[in-house]
Amino acid sequence: MSQISAKDVKDLRDITGVGMMDCKKALEESAGDMQKAIEYLRKKGAALAAKRAEKEAREGMVAIRLSEDRKAGVILELNCETDFVARGAVFTGFAGALTSLALDNAAASPEELLALSLGEEYGNEKVDDAMKTMTGRLGEKLELKRLALFLAPDGVVESYVHPGAQLGSLVQLATDKPEEAGVLARDIAMQVAAASPIVADRSAVPADYIEKEREIYRQQALGQGKPEQFVEKIVTGRLEKYYQEVVLTEQSFIKDGNIKVSDVLSDFRKKHQAQVDVKGFVRYQLGE
């Protein structure tokens, strides 16, 4: 058996990030050949990934990356098994590398990102393979649960990540004054994270869904013995409350509960003589 030096073990650890004992064993199994040892560890990572495939990856983080000009942004949820790993530099660094890769290549889905190749820091592996390698390195199953990409050539993209990186949001505004709209977009991203809207405005709520809700509210009111002449008023009131909960522009603004988000948008239009609308938003909460 070839003599394995401490320097070789250290070099392999620096390249792969795997523990010293595993690096030593890999070199021993590979007769001291560094490239074969790297391949050995990658295969071991893939085997461990297969072994842990049935494990549940419920911890992790929500990671976001924006372009410098705020014309593009990506948000993703990367899962692992324990909070200990989720808070570690290796995991958070890997999540950051994935967001950068997704943004640079305009990857719009997990499948598109998994097919891309990472840089030298991750052995130029495809993300799909790198996930298995990271499983071997961290000893936990990793899962790229979801991803969204916003491109705003005629607007601005902003984000908000709650401390702890378990909740994040991405917002796209369509506006002819993108430089002035940065703060507004940031505020709306915070609104989305805090208030969890489902749609941007009333028109986005399907009419058939509203009719179903209306009938449910009607039957509830009748079941409670409400007089027929008051039922429609009760139903309308409950629908308004529903809109205020799920429609972004109908929600009370988190920075001033006396006004709605729609008022904030109107104020921006008047102040800057500008057009602005919420083009899209995404809210990710870990484990949802």
Swiss-Prot record:
Region called Involved in Mg(2+) ion dislocation from EF-Tu, residue ranges: 82-85
UniProt keywords, alphabetically: Cytoplasm, Elongation factor, Protein biosynthesis
Gene Ontology MF: a single term: translation elongation factor activity
Residue ranges crossing the lipid bilayer per the database entry: none
Gene3D superfamilies: 1.10.286.20, DNA helicase RuvA subunit, C-terminal domain (1.10.8.10), Elongation factor Ts, dimerisation domain (3.30.479.20)
Main location: cytoplasm
CDD domains from the UniProt entry: UBA_EF-Ts
Keyword Cell wall biogenesis/degradation appears in the UniProt entry: no
Top-level taxon in the UniProt lineage: Bacteria
Annotated compartments: Cytoplasm
Pfam families for the chain: EF_TS
Gene Ontology cellular-component terms listed: cytoplasm
Protein family according to the UniProt entry: Belongs to the EF-Ts family.
Summary of the function given for this chain in its UniProt record: Associates with the EF-Tu.GDP complex and induces the exchange of GDP to GTP. It remains bound to the aminoacyl-tRNA.EF-Tu.GTP complex up to the GTP hydrolysis stage on the ribosome.
Protein name, as recorded: Elongation factor Ts
Lineage: Bacteria, Pseudomonadati, Chlorobiota, Chlorobiia, Chlorobiales
